[in-house]
Amino acid sequence: MNKFFSLLLTLLVSAVAFAETPLNYKGEFVGTAGNSDLAPYYMMSNNGGVVTQGKNALLRVGAWKDFDLSKRFSYSFGVDAYAGYSNSKDYLRYNIEQGKVLPMAQKPAAAVLQQLYAEVKFRGVFLSAGMKERKSPLLNSYLGSGDFVQSNNARPIPQVRAGFVDFQNIPFTNGWVQIQGELAFGKYMQDGWLEDHYNYLNGFINTGVWYNYKRCYFRTKPSQPFSVTVGMQMAGQFGGTRKFYVNGELTEVEPYDVKLKDFWDMIIPKSGGNNFGDTQYFNGNTLGSWDFVARYRLKNETELKAYFQWPFEDGSGIGKMNGFDGVWGFEYDSKKPDAIVSGAVFEYLQFTNQSGPTHWAPNDNPDSSMEGEATGGDSYYNNFRYNSYMNLGMSQGTPFIPSIIYNEDGYMRVLDNRLKGFHLGITGKIYAPLRYRMLLSYRKSWGTYSNIRIEPAKNTSFMLEGIYDFKQVKGLSLKGQIAFDKGGLLGDNFGGGLTLSYNGLLNIFGK
């Protein structure tokens, strides 16, 4: 992996010498403070996993070049890093010498390479390699609660990705039907984080795991007032090694060997692998969502959207046997950035059904006389042999289901995925230089089917953000945030932050 990044960095340096215009660059100072070890929910969510702790003082710099979509062949690259101070937080770990669990202070790295990538495109097809922040392909990442499968909630994973640059016309449809799709394979670089935060008492830990992502969407002609987008996206974890602990003792080590065939089996999930469980279940850990967006454009260019995401962990969810589970939303986009309310999103989220409470497969219990099958207990983001769907403690999907960074007991699985609630996001301008964003949510959790809460936990989260653009210095802005959480799910957290940013363009490589 180190050789991979060395080669990628060499390519980036070489590319700068021949760069098309423009080259974007950014520098910012981020300072946050609060009453808790972790930042309030909205300050840490959908932010690339950069700010997770309550107190931070970070300096972040980056440079990037986007595709020139007017050319058949173009390329893109970027580098982004930050360094500074973040406070520590205690997580429980079993001490074999003392025979008990003890708190161990953990904190983010002092310096982080957030993004490093290079991309090429020819016509409508692209190839990308490296770490790049990626947002939801369909939903509003700025105002929404987060995509169920791919959001910008966690730090990016090193990967190779290929697909269509944007939606492409399907031949012989005269532009009335378009297609967009992507396929990616990568490898997690979170082994150190897992080993530092795991309790080593009970349960298991996965290291050396591979990552897969894929999606395919179809869209009707976007130039029409009414347009529909429908499709599916899926993500998976496979390979690596699972170590199982019981009462502080390592009882089992399961290596999941990865062969070339396993990559193909992740593209089209099927059973029959050589590893334990794969002979009866789909290869690795697979999850995904059915996605639908209906958009209507008014005569004044205002757009109204209604959308849903139907989550699934296996065939029962794909067949929509999980009731009303999903993300159900409405979006308003005035296309007038200076309006008092230029955009708004309202979402109702429910993940309580999960195809029922019971999972029973005859192959799991060969000595039983029961021949029936129950395909429930889907337990979103959890898997019977893989840790939660996350990277460095943060969910790769929606943060509305609390990430394992909240698990002070060092448990590597989601503890609250049976929950429901709402989310509201609004943005606009009070007057020309000052933009605002307001986020509000409420949720109620019953835990999981395997770990039911005796009493449901509730939570209310709020954030108000203002961004002031200095007219005197183009590209200079100051962002202020104030946020809180209230309730038993995430705790009572209060905090605020200031970010001073400067964005610029370099045209020295232009023709």
Model segments located where?
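Beta-barrel outer-membrane channel/assembly domains of diderm bacteria
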Residues: F18-R134, S141-G144, F148-F167, G175-I179, ...
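Extracellular loop and loop/strand-boundary signature of outer-membrane beta-barrel proteins
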Residues: M44-G49, Y82-G84, Y94-M104, G144-Q150, ...
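Bacterial Sec-dependent N-terminal signal peptides
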Residues: M1-L23, L500, G504-L506
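Transmembrane beta-strands of outer-membrane beta-barrel pores
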Residues: F29-D37, A81-N87, G124, M131-P137, ...
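Internal, well-ordered domain-core segments that constitute the primary functional module
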Residues: R134-N247
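Short loop/turn motifs that connect adjacent beta-strands in outer-membrane beta-barrel proteins
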Residues: E20-Y25, W64-F77, K121-S128, F167-G181, ...
